[in-house]
């Protein structure tokens, strides 16, 4: 068996075309969806991610504003900037690019962003609503993963899902979203013993640990759906995921590539949340 590739680029392109139409409709009603991004420091990956967000937002006709600061910005100064955007009706989404310098509390920053403009879906209020299955801003990468899974037309209900990784940004929320779809979810992490025992049972395997080629083909059940969230750069400069792709694609029924799988969906779902926030201002 050779797996069908789940094309994140194509799914993202379709979704972005739909969002661009929604932005046009909002503009006719006098609302231009606005996204404010705050970037601190000189982390190359963060700068790359922000460029991607800017390009996507502007391509869809949204208003994008970037505030860039060096690492000397204080926590108090950052919180004050967030307060200004919380009050500014021109902006429907606020995103502070992570990671932050050590002297700034990530928790304080996430909790300072208004839940109504928390397009990353990280605020405790929105996390709580997600837990309850209520309508809210969903975290972008997990939401993108669920959208990709739905594109395969696989019924998620009753499926054995194994999530490898338990970060607040991907692992925990993607498991919760799949639980909300009536899947049976198991989490594995650095303290899990005999991880292969779990992964080999998975109808759907989601791997998000940030370690190159962490999962090999012999840890995957024949015919499983494999979602690889990792983006790792090898010494030769090539990008790879957390799953050993060449072997895994001979075992899986569906698999996401790296790059071109989950990544394009993350920015797309950020745009989705920003448009959703803009729509709320009309109701």
Swiss-Prot record:
Binding site for NADP(+): 165-167, 190, 231
Pathway: One-carbon metabolism; tetrahydrofolate interconversion
Protein purpose: Catalyzes the oxidation of 5,10-methylenetetrahydrofolate to 5,10-methenyltetrahydrofolate and then the hydrolysis of 5,10-methenyltetrahydrofolate to 10-formyltetrahydrofolate.
Annotated PROSITE patterns: THF_DHG_CYH_1, THF_DHG_CYH_2
GO molecular function: methenyltetrahydrofolate cyclohydrolase activity; methylenetetrahydrofolate dehydrogenase (NADP+) activity
CDD domains recorded: NAD_bind_m-THF_DH_Cyclohyd
Protein name: Bifunctional protein FolD
This enzyme's EC code(s): 1.5.1.5, 3.5.4.9
Taxonomic path: Bacteria, Bacillati, Bacillota, Bacilli, Bacillales
GO-annotated cellular components: cytosol
Family: Belongs to the tetrahydrofolate dehydrogenase/cyclohydrolase family.
One Pfam match: THF_DHG_CYH_C
Keyword Amino-acid biosynthesis: yes
